[in-house]
Amino acid sequence: MNRLQLATLLFWTGDDGIQGRKRLQKVVFLLQQAGCQLECQFTLHHFGPYSRDVADICDEMVAAGLIQEDGGPQTGVMQYKYQLKPQTREMLSQISEEQMTKFQKLGTSLTKENLWSLELGSTILYFYGQANNWTDALSKACDFKRVDSADKKSLEALELAKRIVSQVAI
C-alpha cells in the first residue's frame, strides 16, 4: 500500500474518516481480497488479519501531516479516527488512483460495515484463502474467535466474506 492508495481510501469516507485502526486493517484486507492491488502482507492476529504495512503507512502519513489522527491513550479515547487533512483532500481532488477507482463503492460500504462483521468476515476470508472451502473457513474462524459458527452474526460475516470473493470475478 502506498500513500496515494491510503489517501484515496480516506477520501472516499469524506468528513467521516475511518473510525479505528481495526476497521482500517479489515477494510484494506477485504479490498485486497476483492482484487484491489494494495500489496500488503497480512498475518493472523487476535483481531483477525493484520498488516504491518498498513500500520506503517498510516503512521508515516500522520507523521508527515497528511492525515489527521484523533484519539489514542494520550486523549483518553482508545479508538483512533483517521481523516484526510483539508490540504491533502484538496491535493487528492486533483489526481486519482486509477487502479482503485473501481473499488470505490465497495470500499465506501466496507468503511460503514459493522466492526464485528468486518473482523469475523476478514478472519473467515483469511482461512478461506488457506483451504478454499467455506465450511472449513467458517469453522476455523469461529474456533479461532471462540464464537458459534451457527450464530446469526457468524453467518452474516460468512456472507460478507463470500461477497468479497465474488467481487474478484467482476
Task: For each feature predicted by the language model, list its residue ranges.
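Domain-edge interaction signal
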Residues: 1-170
